[in-house]
Structure formats: structure tokens, C-alpha cells
């Protein structure tokens, strides 16, 4: 038994041991072979290097190597070059980086950069010389620096600013392909970045690049597209013509001029406008555009500018790459070409950061890496042809593509007489599956700020995502990628990353618009910005120590209180309410307008939780009207409320509100008849009816609705517009209040007859009164404000607010939504969403200033005001 057990256990041990011995022997034998070969090869290579290598012998005519090989210029012709001549003497002159083979090389005058031992002294090292040849840690491998102070070498008193644009780098690339872009991804990780940066409309290259360096909307700086016509100049602008260098096209003050006007030098390595004598001046240093210049050469040149003596060295720099835009156009955003382009630009960006580190500037320079717009896929089966809508098209000219405009063909003769209204009518609601909406340019969403410029043609087509609108089927420029679309499309979102001593580290911020970058760069340079469309201070949260501290605007026109003198009106103003049978009943409901101080305090707390809007217009006589359910600011000259504010709570029950009393209007006894609207204004046979700024149906009791059925709450509305207005307040407003735990509502009329995005002066409005006493608003605004923390109501919100502003065009028809045969539920919400806006847009159009009593830093209030809600969820 014992013997059997011994045999049974010993046998496997012997087999395993033998197997291990065999493996060990094979491995040892292999190692001996490798060592022998390695030793032999090593000795041989050293012998070859000693006797037949061109290392440190390039173009030395006297050198004779192994078997009399040569390294001079003529060796290729003779056929006697040493074995490594091509790699050592030729290829080394074509690359921008060092490698171990190049380290310590003999200086080659034809080299793009040097890896010789004296290159640091002569300031011509390749960007990675120290990390490759001297063993220093590369920028990519180095940990994120968290120093609080600038780490600038001697001679750099203040951090330089580099503005780096990679054309067409859509924000989504940064997350989808991050592992393929280690350098850019490190900048994102170590510095500050936004989820995306919003481009201006149209999302094209020239308009957005010039917006970035001026802080102006395209309508303000004049570069409204890559292609355009100016009737006053009677000239056409395009990227392929020399006309683009005519200063007459370029308005505003670009960043390089702002810096130069305040004693700084500026250098631009390509940027739209940089080779134009804007205001008679060029940048201190600039390069005429040449798209064939390698990216590495551009980077190398910028690094050399940083090596200039202090007195000659710029403080502001721009850098521009055409990629990944070019590859996106050719192959579409999801293509191998784009992936390759991203790797190429990442490598070049890494070269910049290595070059900065080599100069000890990597934690001294403030660098901003951004894009002008995104990119989307287009398809040849997603084309809208104007020949499908017009029997002939030879009478108009069309700028085709994702952001089409239409004007007269015969220019300048027919430019102003061209019937734009008829074109829009003929293109409206023609097909159930139409993939564009036609607009007269003044009717475009106000958030676009794309109207007030003679170069913006009056007919505009707002095209669906991935679709193109063109003249006819002869246009075959489809497929691949394109941009120019609605700037709310996610595919049009651009990147924004920043790094440097002035920026916070390892931080992600909410999206913002590229009009804000100009002010930010001025703060980095510690200079005063020129007037612009940005909101100075709204990006303070990107900086460790903000240079500029904003404050609330000072009120220009003070308010009064419309006092209660008599419960019975001195004039009826042609108003009538059959439900109030006698003067006693009339007196009773009017007495409800006479609030005590305690009641005023209570209504202000609930209905003005963030303070009353301040009036920034000059000479505006207005008074406050207090009610239990709402507060309004009444404009006496306009005879209507400028704004009305109230809070809609989250409904705790679903019981219906009391029915509204029909056909009941009365004069507000607090407002003199000479400053009030007459109800008879709405009785004439016209397309205008009255609407209520504060909806009577929102009152919680049947009696309190009488506070809203008064002349001081009346605003003129087109019949069709009122349908949409009433649906919003009766359905959508309740929905928002339910979802957000209550909302504060501020709404009012807008007058922008000259469609410049700013409130009209009184004389401008007077021109459009059309022989009536009541001016008709061009738009109405609604601003919904709730607490970001939905466990709090608006009136008890301790932290950040959430906003949802709308600016709705006031037009006689709803043709924009093609509502024929559709219930309001199918189109009203979409219309409001299409006209989403920023609070700042509302302020500009009304001359009002919001949230001044909200206890929060002003810079954070400005973040709120410049925030644009979005509804797009897919790319």
C-alpha cells in the first residue's frame, strides 16, 4: 500500500521536473544566442558607426568611411554614400523633432531645427530637444502644475497670451477621440474647459474668427458670411478674391489693435482680418495667409517670436490651423480623415507645449485653444431645390448651403426694390415635409443678432440639420461635411480649453458664447476692451484672480408710484364690464387696488423675489402698480405696462382655476385717463385685439381676477398671436411651474422696429404708430426664473437660479409654424423653443436690468444673464 502510494506520487514529479528542465534549457540557449548576436551586432554596429557612419560627418567632403563610403553632397550621384547617409544627413533636415540618433548631431544648416550640442545657445533647437537629448521630463509626461503664481523666466514680466484656433474642431471630438489626442487631452485635464463654446450664426469660419477677436456679432463687425455683397460698396466679398483685404469690409477693433493701441505688441500667424489694414493698421508682426505652410513651421515661428528680445517681443499671439475643418468637409465628421487630422493637430500642439516647456514658459503663457464652429454630415439625398418652389429662378441670386440667403439677381439696380416678402410667402408651408423655414431677416430669432446690416440679405432660410438648400439640381456639392447651421445644433458646438497662470486648473465650466472671449483676453493682458457685444465679467469664473469686477448697472429713470385717489374712475375710457352692475360693485373691485403697506410688502416678496427690473432707458416716466397676485411697471408714454412680474407656484392640486369673467374691462383708477389706453381702440375693424400681460386666469380666486381686467394690464396683440400667447399661459406655463417647483414670470412688450437688437428710441416708435395712440410691439418677452435646486421655490432660493427666456415675434399670422389644421399642442411649444433667448438679449431689447436684488456676486448674475438654454439632445 505504502509502495503504491510512493510510486503514484513520485512519477508525476519526475515528469514535471523534466519538462521544466527542458524549458529552462531552451530559454537559456535562446538567451545565449540573443546575447551572442547582440554582442556581435553591437560590436559590428559600433565598428560600422566608427568606420562607415555619417553621424557627425554629414557633407564633410574629406570623410572616407568603411570601404571608402562618403557623406558629401555628391555621394548619391556617385553611388558611394555610407549606409546611413539618407537617415542621418537628409531625413534629419526634414523633421521638426529630435530623436536619439540626432542628439549631438553636427549642425546641418538646411535643418528645420537642430539637435546639436550648441542649439540652446543658438536658439534653434527642436521643440523636444531637452526631453529627448537631455533627459528632461516632457510636457506630456509631466504632472499637472498647480502653482498659484506665474512661473515666468527672467524677461517675462507678465504672461504672454496665445490664441490658438483649430478650424472646425467640434466639441464632440474632444470626448469621442480623446485617447488619440494625448496633448490636447492633457490641456483639458490640467486646465479649464467648457463642455462647448457656442459659435455665432452663421456658423462659418470668417464670421466667427472675427467675432472671437472683436467680441462683436457678425451683424456688428460686418463679416456676416464667407461670401456676401454690399450694395453701398457695390462689391462682392469672398475667400477667393482680393476684395477680402479691403478694410471697408472689416468693422470693429480686433484684439491685436486693442493690444497695440495700449502699448503692447501683437503677432498673428494667420487669422481672418490680420492681413488687412483695419483702421489703417496691421499687427506688429503678421504672416500673409498660405495654407501650404506646415503646422510645425507655424509653431516653430511662434516659438521664435517668443525668443525675441523683450523690447521686440509681442505679448499677444494668434495661431490658426485649417484642420480638422478641411478633413471634415472632405470626409464628414465621422471619418478616418478627421481622425487622422485630429492626430496631426494634436502632434503639432504637443510641439508647441514642448517648445514652451523648453523655454520654461509652459506655466507662464496663458494659452486659449478653441474652434470657430463644429461640423455636420451632409447627404446628396437631403437637398432642397428652389426649382421645386418657383417656376423660374433666374430673377434672384442665392447663397446656397446650410445658411442660405436670397437677394435680387440684378444688382445694385434691383437690390432695394426686390420683393423679399413675396419670396418668403412663396416658400412658406409649401410641403408637409419641408426642411427649411423661410424668414424675413428681421423676423429671425433675436438671439442670433443677425439682421441689422445691409450685407445680410432680407430673405433667409433656416435649414434643418444635415440638409442643404440650393438653387437647382445642377448643384452637386453635397456629401462629406458642412457647417453654417443653427448655432444651437450640437454638431455646431466648438471647443474651448485654456491653461496658464491666470486660469483655474482641472475645472469644467458651463458653455458660453464666443463673443465673450475678447473681454477675457483683454483681462489676461490687463488692458481696456473696446466697445463690444460681450458682457464683461461673465467669464470671471474661469480666472483665479479676475482683473475686472463688474457691478450692476445704475438705474437711469427712477420710478414713481401710481397712487390710489378715488375708487370710481373719472372716465370710463370706453370700457365696459356687464358683471359689475352698479357703482357700488365697481367701487368694491377698484378698492382692491388700494393695497396697504403690509400687502405691498407681501406681494413684492412673492412676485418680485429678485427685485424689480431697473429701467436703463433715459426719460422714461413710469410707475409701479401693486396687486396681490402681480406687480407691474407701467410706461406712461406707451400707455401700457413695460413689464409684469408674478410667481406661479407648483400646483399642489389639479383642481381647475376659477373661470375668467368674459368681456369685462374697466379703467384703472390709479392711472390718469390721458396716460391710459381706451378700450375702443380694440373695437375698430382691425386685426388687433387686446391681450393681458398678466393672465386673469392665473388668479387663485374669482374676485382677484378683477385686478387683471383693467386697462393698465392691456397690451395690443394680433388675433393669431394671442392664440399662441393664451395657450402658453394656460398650458405651458403650468407645465414649467410643475417641473421646476414654481416659476417667477416677468413678461412685457418689445419695440425693435429698426431690428438692431436694442430698444427703440421714442421717435423711432412714433414713426410706426400708424395714426393710432397705442404702438404695436414688434415682440413680446417672457422670462421664467426658478431655483436650480428644485427643492426650493423661487421666492426662497438660496443659491443659483435657472432661467428660460423667450422673445417671440409679434406678427399677424402664425405661418412660421404652418399651423393650418393643427391644434396648439402640436406647434406652440415648438415656436417658443425656436425663439429661446438669453436674459441679456431681453435686457438689450427692453432697456431693463434684472436680478439686482438677488444676493449673489454680480459676475455670477452675469453668467446667468448670458446663459442660453438649449433643447438639442443629439448630434
Curated annotation (Swiss-Prot):
It holds the Pfam family Phosphodiest. Ca(2+) binds at residues 752, 754, 756, 758, 760. Residues 582-875 are annotated as: Nuclease. One of its GO terms (biological process) is phosphate-containing compound metabolic process. Disulfide bonds join 54-71, 58-89, 69-82, 75-81, 98-115, 103-133, 113-126, 119-125, 144-190, 152-364, 380-478, 429-818, 562-623, 575-679, 577-664, 787-797. Its cofactor is Zn(2+). The active site is at 205 (nucleophile). Detected on bile ducts in liver, and in blood serum (at protein level). Detected in prostate and uterus. Detected on basophils, but not neutrophils. Induction: Up-regulated by stimulation by allergen or by cross-linking with IgE. The IgE-mediated activation is enhanced by tetradecanoyl phorbol acetate (TPA), a stimulator of the PKC pathway, and inhibited by the P13 kinase inhibitors, LY294002 and wortmannin. Up-regulated in invasive bile duct cancers. Changing residue 179 to C: Causes the formation of covalently linked homodimers in solution. One of its GO terms (cellular component) is plasma membrane. Zn(2+) 2 binds at residues 325, 329, 483. Residues 31-875 are extracellular. Its main location: membrane. It comes from the Eukaryota. ATP binds at residues 204, 226, 275, 289. It is an enzyme of class 3 (hydrolase). The chain crosses the membrane at residues 12-30. A motif (Cell attachment site) lies at residues 78-80. Monomer and homodimer. PANTHER family: ECTONUCLEOTIDE PYROPHOSPHATASE/PHOSPHODIESTERASE, ECTONUCLEOTIDE PYROPHOSPHATASE_PHOSPHODIESTERASE FAMILY MEMBER 3. This is Ectonucleotide pyrophosphatase/phosphodiesterase family member 3. It comes from Homo sapiens.
Amino acid at each position: 500500500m505504502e509502495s503504491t502510494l510512493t510510486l503514484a506520487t513520485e512519477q508525476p514529479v519526475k515528469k514535471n521536473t523534466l519538462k521544466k528542465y527542458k524549458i529552462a534549457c531552451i530559454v537559456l540557449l535562446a538567451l545565449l544566442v540573443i546575447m551572442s548576436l547582440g554582442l556581435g551586432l553591437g560590436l559590428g554596429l559600433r565598428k560600422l558607426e566608427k568606420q562607415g557612419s555619417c553621424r557627425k560627418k554629414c557633407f564633410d567632403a574629406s570623410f572616407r568611411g568603411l570601404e571608402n563610403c562618403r557623406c558629401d553632397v555628391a555621394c548619391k550621384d556617385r553611388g558611394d554614400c555610407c549606409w546611413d547617409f539618407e537617415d542621418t544627413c537628409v531625413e534629419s533636415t526634414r523633421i521638426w523633432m529630435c530623436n536619439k540618433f540626432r542628439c549631438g548631431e553636427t549642425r546641418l544648416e538646411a535643418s528645420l531645427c537642430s539637435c546639436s550640442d550648441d542649439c540652446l545657445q543658438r536658439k534653434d533647437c527642436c521643440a523636444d530637444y531637452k526631453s529627448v537629448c537631455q533627459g528632461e521630463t516632457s510636457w506630456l509626461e509631466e504632472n499637472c502644475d498647480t502653482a498659484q503664481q506665474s512661473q515666468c523666466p527672467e524677461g517675462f514680466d507678465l504672461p504672454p497670451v496665445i490664441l490658438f484656433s483649430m478650424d472646425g474642431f467640434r466639441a464632440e471630438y474632444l470626448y469621442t477621440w480623446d485617447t488619440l489626442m494625448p496633448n490636447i487631452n492633457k490641456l483639458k485635464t490640467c486646465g479649464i474647459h467648457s463642455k462647448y463654446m457656442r459659435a455665432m450664426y452663421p456658423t462659418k469660419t470668417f464670421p466667427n474668427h472675427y467675432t472671437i477677436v472683436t467680441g462683436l456679432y457678425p451683424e456688428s463687425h460686418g463679416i456676416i458670411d464667407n461670401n456676401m455683397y454690399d450694395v453701398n460698396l457695390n462689391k462682392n466679398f469672398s475667400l477667393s478674391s482680393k476684395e477680402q483685404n479691403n478694410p471697408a469690409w472689416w468693422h470693429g477693433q480686433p484684439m491685436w489693435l486693442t493690444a497695440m493701441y495700449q502699448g503692447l505688441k501683437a503677432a498673428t500667424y494667420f487669422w481672418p482680418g490680420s492681413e488687412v489694414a483695419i483702421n489703417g493698421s496691421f499687427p506688429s508682426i503678421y504672416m500673409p495667409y498660405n495654407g501650404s505652410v506646415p503646422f510645425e513651421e507655424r509653431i516653430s515661428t511662434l516659438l521664435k517670436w517668443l525668443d525675441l528680445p523683450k523690447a521686440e517681443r509681442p505679448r499677444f499671439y494668434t495661431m490658426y490651423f485649417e484642420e480638422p475643418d478641411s478633413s471634415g468637409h472632405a470626409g464628414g465628421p465621422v471619418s478616418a480623415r478627421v481622425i487622422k487630422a485630429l492626430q496631426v493637430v494634436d502632434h503639432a500642439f504637443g510641439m508647441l507645449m514642448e517648445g514652451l516647456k523648453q523655454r520654461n514658459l509652459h506655466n507662464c503663457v496663458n494659452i486659449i485653444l478653441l474652434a470657430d464652429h463644429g461640423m455636420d454630415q451632409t447627404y446628396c439625398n437631403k437637398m432642397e431645390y428652389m426649382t421645386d418652389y418657383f417656376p423660374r429662378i433666374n430673377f434672384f441670386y442665392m447663397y446656397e448651403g446650410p445658411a442660405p440667403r436670397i437677394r435680387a439677381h440684378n444688382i445694385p439696380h434691383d437690390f432695394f426694390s426686390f420683393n423679399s416678402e413675396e419670396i418668403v410667402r412663396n416658400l412658406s408651408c409649401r410641403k408637409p415635409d419641408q426642411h427649411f423655414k423661410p424668414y424675413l431677416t428681421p423676423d429671425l430669432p433675436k438671439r442670433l443678432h443677425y439682421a441689422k446690416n445691409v450685407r445680410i440679405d432680407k430673405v433667409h432660410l433656416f435649414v434643418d440639420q444635415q440638409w442643404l438648400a440650393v438653387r437647382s439640381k445642377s448643384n452637386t456639392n453635397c456629401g462629406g461635411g458642412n457647417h453654417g447651421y443653427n448655432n444651437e445644433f450640437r454638431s455646431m458646438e466648438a471647443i474651448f480649453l485654456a491653461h496658464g497662470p491666470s486660469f483655474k486648473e482641472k475645472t469644467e465650466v458651463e458653455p458660453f458664447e464666443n463673443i465673450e472671449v475678447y473681454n477675457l483676453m483683454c483681462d489676461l493682458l490687463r488692458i481696456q476692451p473696446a466697445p463690444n457685444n460681450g458682457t464683461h465679467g461673465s467669464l470671471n469664473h474661469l480666472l483665479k484672480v479676475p482683473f475686472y469686477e463688474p457691478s450692476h448697472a445704475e438705474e437711469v429713470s427712477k420710478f414713481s408710484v401710481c397712487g390710489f385717489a378715488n375708487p370710481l374712475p373719472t372716465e370710463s375710457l370706453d370700457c365696459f364690464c356687464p358683471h359689475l352692475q352698479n357703482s357700488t360693485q365697481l367701487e368694491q373691485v377698484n378698492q382692491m387696488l388700494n393695497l396697504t403697506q403690509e400687502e405691498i410688502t407681501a406681494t413684492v416678496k412673492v412676485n418680485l423675489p429678485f427685485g424689480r427690473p431697473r429701467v436703463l432707458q433715459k426719460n422714461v416716466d413710469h410707475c409701479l402698480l401693486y396687486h396681490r397676485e402681480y406687480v407691474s411697471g407701467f410706461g406712461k408714454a406707451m400707455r401700457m405696462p413695460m413689464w409684469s412680474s408674478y410667481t406661479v407656484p407648483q400646483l399642489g392640486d389639479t383642481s381647475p382655476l376659477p373661470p375668467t369673467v368674459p368681456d369685462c374691462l374697466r379703467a384703472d383708477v390709479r392711472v390718469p385717463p390721458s396716460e391710459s389706453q381706451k378700450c375702443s381702440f380694440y373695437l375698430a375693424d382691425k386685426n388687433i385685439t387686446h391681450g393681458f400681460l398678466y393672465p386673469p386666469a392665473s388668479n387663485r380666486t374669482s374676485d382677484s381676477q378683477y385686478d387683471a381686467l383693467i386697462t393698465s394690464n392691456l397690451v395690443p396683440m394680433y388675433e393669431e398671436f394671442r392664440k399662441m400667447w393664451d395657450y402658453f399661459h394656460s398650458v405651458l406655463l403650468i407645465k414649467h411651474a410643475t417641473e421646476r417647483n414654481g416659476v417667477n414670470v416677468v413678461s412685457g412688450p418689445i419695440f425693435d422696429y429698426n431690428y438692431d437688437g436694442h430698444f427703440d428710441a421714442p421717435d423711432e416708435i412714433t414713426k410706426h404708430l400708424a395714426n393710432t395712440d397705442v404702438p404695436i410691439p414688434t415682440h413680446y418677452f417672457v422670462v421664467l426664473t426658478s431655483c436650480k435646486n428644485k427643492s426650493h421655490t423661487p421666492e426662497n432660493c438660496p443659491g443659483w437660479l435657472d432661467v428660460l427666456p423667450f422673445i417671440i415675434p409679434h406678427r399677424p399670422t402664425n405661418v412660421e409654424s404652418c399651423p393650418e389644421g393643427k391644434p396648439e399642442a402640436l406647434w406652440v411649444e415648438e415656436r417658443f423653443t425656436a425663439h429661446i433667448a438669453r436674459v441679456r438679449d431681453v435686457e438689450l431689447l427692453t432697456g431693463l436690468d434684472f436680478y439686482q436684488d438677488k444676493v449673489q456676486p454680480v459676475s455670477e448674475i452675469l453668467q446667468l444673464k448670458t446663459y442660453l438654454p438649449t433643447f438639442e439632445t443629439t448630434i
